[in-house]
Amino acid sequence: MNPKSSTPKIPRPKNAFILFRQHYHRILIDEWTAQGVEIPHNSNISKIIGTKWKGLQPEDKAHWENLAEKEKLEHERKYPEYKYKPVRKSKKKQLLLKEIEQQQQQQQKEQQQQKQSQPQLQQPFNNNIVLMKRAHSLSPSSSVSSSNSYQFQLNNDLKRLPIPSVNTSNYMVSRSLSGLPLTHDKTARDLPQLSSQLNSIPYYSAPHDPSTRHHYLNVAQAQPRANSTPQLPFISSIINNSSQTPVTTTTTSTTTATSSPGKFSSSPNSSVLENNRLNSINNSNQYLPPPLLPSLQDFQLDQYQQLKQMGPTYIVKPLSHTRNNLLSTTTPTHHHIPHIPNQNIPLHQIINSSNTEVTAKTSLVSPK
């Protein structure tokens, strides 16, 4: 029975294959039951009968076609108003989609009715709860985990800060050496931002009083660097001149001031031109900031990187006062090459006083 119409559904008239299938289906089941064979599924039985139908002779098929014609005439006599109206699959799908859409619309209407039926006074209260939850999630917590996460985020933000490279004429450290191209120039204004490479250093603002200005200069010169560690021996401290006798002490990373107030020994990273400018300070017009105390470590870091690229063997020559020919590219003389395992070593182990050139082989350790 069709629920939309009260009239029963009229079956279609049987064709030749359906009549043939009904006939042989009964025969096969009777044979299998007599033999005690398990009866297969109807789909398999239809395949067996289909192969037999294709293998029939045209004369045998004509018999079943005649039976189908008689079946059709009998069907017309019983149902004279019958007309075959096939329903396409697309229409079936469309009907299913329409039914699904109708069900969804009904559910939405029911939900809207339920929301409207609720009292409207509860809405501001619920909104306040949501705002309180958000504020609680954004408030700083006193737990250790939240403080650690905040510190970690702060450290990452500090690491992402750019290191400025200002190339000005005011107290700029000249670091260009022949045969040793260095990476960048720094000014005294840039040093407080180099926390990843340098230790804490004093930085003073420019006072207007000349007496306090000299006081700051003397304090900055005499103050040693905190937490200083032994670094790679500076090459200029190993060999001064070929005529001089070797000294058995090494240079450390600290910078000391001389007794004279007008002259003081700056770090090896500063040039001779800078030392000349130190001697010609005018109290009324110019002010010189404190010397760059950690510049030795910077220079040794760049020196280590350059020596690492050149290889484990390098040549040291006597240096002039201008520090221009730091490394030599000449062919080394064939002498015994001692090995330097540590940083602080006696100089008589590596210096050959009879020659002007000294070849040394060292295991470099990166300065911290």
UniProtKB/Swiss-Prot annotation:
DNA-binding recorded as keyword: yes
Subcellular location: Nucleus
Biased composition (Low complexity): 102-121
Region (Disordered): 100-121, 242-273
Keywords from the UniProt entry: DNA-binding, Nucleus, Repressor, Transcription, Transcription regulation
SUPFAM superfamilies attached to this UniProt entry: HMG-box (SSF47095)
The species this protein was found in: Saccharomyces cerevisiae (strain ATCC 204508 / S288c)
SMART domains: HMG
Residues annotated as signal peptide: none
GO molecular function: cis-regulatory region sequence-specific DNA binding; DNA binding, bending; DNA-binding transcription activator activity, RNA polymerase II-specific; DNA-binding transcription repressor activity, RNA polymerase II-specific; RNA polymerase II cis-regulatory region sequence-specific DNA binding; sequence-specific DNA binding; transcription corepressor activity
DNA-binding region: 10-83
Protein name: Repressor ROX1
Cellular component terms per the entry's GO annotation: chromatin; nucleus
Functional description taken from the UniProt entry: Transcription factor that represses the expression of HEM13, COX5B, ANB1, CYC7 or AAC3 (hypoxic function). Binds to the DNA sequence 5'-RRRTAACAAGAG-3'.
Additional comment: Present with 238 molecules/cell in log phase SD medium.
GO biological process: cell differentiation; cellular response to increased oxygen levels; cellular response to osmotic stress; cellular response to salt stress; negative regulation of transcription by RNA polymerase II; positive regulation of transcription by RNA polymerase II
Entry annotated with the keyword Membrane: no
UniProt xrefs under Pfam families: HMG_box
